[in-house]
Amino acid sequence: MQMASKRALVTGINGFTGRYMAAELQANGYEVIGTGSQPSAAPDYHQVDLADGPGLRALLAELQPDVIVHLAAIAFVGHGAADAFYQVNLIGTRNLLEAIAACGKTPECVLIASSANVYGNVSEGMLDEHTPPAPANDYAVSKLAMEYMARLWCDRLPIVITRPFNYTGVGQAENFLLPKIVSHFQRKAPAIELGNLDVWRDFSDVRAVVRAYRGLIEARAVGQTVNVSSGITHSLREVIAKCSAITGHTLDVQVNPAFVRANEVKTLCGDNARLRALVPGWETPALDETLGWMLAGQ
């Protein structure tokens, strides 16, 4: 007799990560239901705003999911209105947790996506989960506040918090750096304006990130805060060289002083030892493979 599939609720399912998360869960036997703030004709989709506490409570009472992956957030650090970070990332997440706790069924796992931005700009080198947070912008402060708030619910709900470092893939918006670079190579643009090329960052593949999330859910990593990172750094200069080698196109890179951040940290790298211990065998593709996939656009 076949076991009934587990029901997974993915908030922000129509976002960049949400689409990959849904595919990953469906491929592994989950029944996936999604929410978002915008209308959608997608099946098993419910439009509900995180600000709508009564709407969330009614929906959770109806759905009673086995697992929840909370991805809905304002994720672009350069987003203009600071108060939106707090309304969505902090208050919205609290509304969701309140709705889950009141729904009449305790889920197996509630995975909440935070961000490695909480570590801020004060630390060089390898960052692990014990590195003291030092958020440097409203986005990061909202995510760290969300983490602290979520911990208030840990006696009632099985929560795991992830801190993903930079990740990318096909379909990510061009206001993020790697899709911007890839797009210029795809169009064979003659030139690109960037900031400091000699910063080193930790890049993962979105397909590996959602595998990590599923692995953490299935490992029942409840109560844990977990970095999701490659543990390897690449400079932006190196990223451009890799794209050039893959496409055969040469891009004239112009440094725009407006894009150079003051006091920018040269190297940021995430220690993924905790993730690897919880999800044995997890790894992210080499950056060349991810860039090749993105440049092919499929």
Protein language model annotation of sequence segments:
Residues 124-125, 138, 148-202, 206-215, ...:
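NAD(P)-dependent short-chain dehydrogenase/reductase
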Residues 94-138:
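Conserved Rossmann-fold NAD(P)-dependent oxidoreductase catalytic core, especially the SDR/UDP-sugar
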